[in-house]
Amino acid sequence: AYAAAPFAPDAVRAVLPHLSLLVLNAVEAEQLRAATGEGVGALGLAHVLVTLGAEGCLWLHEGREWRFAAPRVEAVDTTGAGDTFTGFALALLDEGREMPEAVALAQKAAALKVTRAGAADAIPARAEAERFGEAPEAG
């Protein structure tokens, strides 16, 4: 896996042949297209995740494209949202989770992160991300 932030065309080109997963945001995806002349879907990678901020995430795999909507929240500070998403997604994939499950929890974590001011100190715990969006228990 490789997260292309900050984007450096030569660095990305150098690692592409060794990747099975590339994670980048929409701006970086456009920069990569400009640098290589190809869209991210034409790079021959097994998996590409493109984060789209409040619009969610795009997963490219085996010539297909899946879009995942992001949870709707009131953003306070978007610093670290992409890092939160990437960290959660990679940790879950490393556990053997399937991509849709990894993306779903990573998006919950990133959505929670942006509701708080700060960077690393505002990243939610996994249990908190897992509970996010659940209906409260009846009391």
Describe the role of every protein-language-model region.
Residues A1-G39, E55-C57:
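Conserved beta-alpha-beta core of the PfkB/ribokinase-like small-molecule kinase fold
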Residues T36-G139:
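Conserved phosphate-binding/catalytic region of the ribokinase-like
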